[in-house]
Amino acid sequence: GNTKYTAGAMRFAYENGDQLMSLLDKPNDKRIKDTDFGSYTQEKFETDLLNFNDGRPLSHEQKILVSKSLETIQWLSSHNVKFEPIYSRQSFLKDGKHIFWGGLTLASENEGVGLFDQELDAFLSLGGKIFYDSPVTNLIYEVGKVKGVYVNEEKVNADSVICASGGFEANDGLRKSYIGDNWINAKVRGTPHNTGDGLKMALEIGAVKHGLYNGCHATPMDLHMKNYGGLDLEPSERKNYRKICY
């Protein structure tokens, strides 16, 4: 997925710095005592989201994102997924104190790669299993219910299936279809594997489209920048390849 291509920063609502202490990988960092983390309330989080909604009210999913954000980050922390304050780009020094701004306070060490590694360790420690070279080619759909997946031609039954297969940013045709003709030329800064396969499989059995298919997060890029890549760069140099998502 795109996790490795991100900055590993986590946006979540919190009332004060005390709520952050249990989330930190290094709570004894000497800078902590001279740090003002401020607050990032649910109301502020909602306001920031509305600024990206182009006049639309908050969706049900956005409201859940806000209301469950602290609870979710605490759950990750309970499974040893830890974070560090983003001193380098989300704080400034004033009168001897590190003052945080913008609501983006914590990130994983080593950015998205570090976040991926921590989450993978947590998944495996909970008994999760990963099957490599096992592409899902179709959903098993019987009597109005998804009952598993086909891995190549092999049938794998399951009580439930989560299509955590990303969006369609790496699919030129779907970008053109949903976002516009010019988007066929867009540079893809994230993974080459998010080609919309999971979405297509779900739609083929009658799933209802949900969300803003004609919107995306994008940023100006060099015309000659290569598609994908960037994981071989140091985190501080990787910003040019942080993900573009749909």
Question: What positions do the PLM features span?
Answer:
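FAD cofactor-binding and catalytic pocket of flavoenzymes
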Residues: 34, 221-246
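Glycine-rich loop(s) and the adjacent beta-strand/alpha-helix scaffold that form part
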Residues: 156-229
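Dinucleotide-binding Rossmann-like beta1-alpha1 core, especially the glycine-rich loop
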Residues: 15-79
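Fold-independent oxyanion-binding glycine-rich loops
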Residues: 7, 14, 133-135, 152-153, ...
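Conserved redox-cofactor binding core of oxidoreductases
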Residues: 58-154, 171-174, 222-224
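Hydrophobic alpha-helical scaffolding
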Residues: 35, 62, 105-110, 185-192, ...
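Conserved N-terminal glycine-rich FAD pyrophosphate-binding loop of Rossmann-like flavoproteins
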Residues: 1-28, 219
